[in-house]
UniProtKB/Swiss-Prot annotation:
Keyword vocabulary terms for this entry: Amino-acid biosynthesis, Cytoplasm, NADP, Oxidoreductase, Proline biosynthesis
Organism for this UniProt entry: Nostoc sp. (strain PCC 7120 / SAG 25.82 / UTEX 2576)
Metabolic or biological pathway: Amino-acid biosynthesis; L-proline biosynthesis; L-glutamate 5-semialdehyde from L-glutamate: step 2/2
Top-level taxon of the source organism: Bacteria
Family: Belongs to the gamma-glutamyl phosphate reductase family.
Protein name, UniProt field: Gamma-glutamyl phosphate reductase
GO (cellular component) term, any one: cytoplasm
Entry EC no(s): 1.2.1.41
Coiled-coil portions: none
The encoding gene: proA
Protein's job: Catalyzes the NADPH-dependent reduction of L-glutamate 5-phosphate into L-glutamate 5-semialdehyde and phosphate. The product spontaneously undergoes cyclization to form 1-pyrroline-5-carboxylate.
């Protein structure tokens, strides 16, 4: 297919999605929840087909020499699929984000202004591997009244085709037009999707650093996402050693390919001699490769030396860099210089240190005495997430339903005109909030 043919075909798909989304936006909460329940049931019924498609994807990816972190994201086992379907049902239980009155204000007698939440329109989701992301995103899109065009990586095509097939079958029995969900599978379609600013309202990329940056640099459509997942745990001088070990190990090994896994461990110099040998042993038992700065090597001479590159590297693997710092101030400076504004944690029993850390670390998530792996829409109670944003502007952090809506102003009058409120005898506004 030529570039022109791809563009023409994708324009048609985008128009169909937008039309279907406009009808979805008008449906009742009950109708949307029924559709979400039907999607969950259809996915359960297609479980074997989806899992087999993923096995086929994994085998093909292995033959092509896929990178280890990407392979881990690609794998969809029965446990992951079950959790994803449970997440769909959880979205059905969430409050409807559409039609919420944010402002209701009388400007004058009979002249009332409202600000009401409404869908964004059509979402363009581009992701590498991680087929369960498609399930999460589809459920959130339906609940928030948005159409969604999914573009999966070539390594996950079979899995995503099986998922979207099941979703469309489920929607076909409901009031939601199945055309509200679309799937693209080729690189050429990715480039054309990024040009569809007439039909697509938001692009959400999920993948590697280079991939997200490519998307950000090649579209005029607003992009929500993050390009890096360089997270830290700082072990303060007042840390409880056992808590520090447990959190450090969990934040690194529970799922090292996740963007909320830590890449650097910062340790206060006054606690380093006691803490580092213990945490090193715990991490070694989980086969984590350690790298350390000069002072760390004096305590752990058997590990590799860290370089400046390590502080800005997202390993997404069983590798962890360690640096000893002289103070909380130095730890915060390191995080703000090398971190990705994703999620960073402090382990301490010092309340004042927590307040300083929370106030000065410029990340979407700042945690105290708990693992960075909690930075997740499902764990936050959002039902699921479409992605994580490290941007300064909202939405920020794990993005659930609230990040997929915008608002419009509705005003109702009785023949009111602006001339009444201007000039020498201008009538004053009442500006009374209901």
């Amino acid at each position: 297919m030529t570039t022109l043919q791809v563009a023409s075909s994708l324009n048609d798909i985008a128009q169909q999605t937008r039309q279907a989304a406009s009808l979805l936006a008008m449906l009742s909460t009950e109708a949307k929840n029924q559709a979400i329940a039907a999607v969950a049931q259809a996915l359960e019924s297609a479980k074997e087909e989806i899992l087999q498609a993923n096995i086929d994807d994994c085998e093909a990816a292995t033959a092509e020499g896929i990178a280890k972190p990407l392979y881990k994201r690609l794998q969809l086992d029965e446990h992951k699929l079950r959790d994803a379907i449970a997440g769909v049902r959880d979205v059905g239980k969430l409050a409807d984000p559409i039609g919420q009155v944010q402002i209701q204000r009388e400007l004058d007698t009979g002249l009332v202004l409202k600000r009401i939440t409404c869908p964004l329109g059509v979402l363009g989701i581009i992701f590498e591997a991680r087929p369960e992301a498609a399930i999460q995103i589809i459920s959130l899109a339906i609940k928030s009244g948005n159409g969604v065009i999914l573009k999966c990586g070539k390594e996950a095509v079979r899995s995503c085709e099986a998922i979207v097939k099941a979703v469309k079958q489920g929607l076909s029995t409901t009031d939601v037009n199945p055309e509200v969900v679309q799937l693209l599978t080729t690189r050429e379609e990715t480039l054309e999707l990024l040009r569809l600013d007439k039909y697509v309202d938001l692009i959400i990329p999920r993948g590697s650093n280079s991939f997200v940056r490519f998307v950000q640099e090649n579209t005029r459509i607003p992009v929500l996402g993050h390009a890096d997942g360089i997270c830290h745990v700082y072990i303060d001088k007042s840390a409880d050693i056992e808590k520090a070990i447990a959190v450090s190990v969990d934040a690194k090994v529970q799922y090292p390919a996740a963007c909320n896994a830590i890449e650097t461990l910062l340790v206060h110099q006054s606690i380093a001699a006691e803490f580092l040998p213990k945490v090193a042993q715990a991490l070694a038992e989980r086969e984590v490769e350690l790298k350390g700065d000069e002072r760390t090597l004096q305590i752990l001479p058997e590990i590799a030396a860290a370089t400046a590159i390590d502080w800005e590297t997202e390993y997404s693997d069983f590798i962890l860099s360690i640096k000893i710092v002289d103070s909380l101030t130095e730890a915060i400076a390191h995080i703000n210089q090398y971190g990705s504004r994703h999620t960073d944690a402090i382990i301490t029993e010092d309340v004042a240190a927590v307040k300083t850390f929370f106030g000065l670390v410029n990340s979407a998530g700042v945690f105290h005495n708990c693992s960075t792996r909690f930075a997740d829409g499902f764990r936050y109670g959002f039902g699921a997430e479409v992605g994580i944003s490290t941007q300064q502007m909202p939405p920020r952090g794990p993005v659930g339903l609230e990040g997929l809506v915008t608002y419009k102003y509705q005003m109702t009058g009785a023949g009111h005109i602006v001339a009444t409120y201007t000039g020498e005898n201008a009538k004053p506004f009442t500006h009374k909030d209901f």
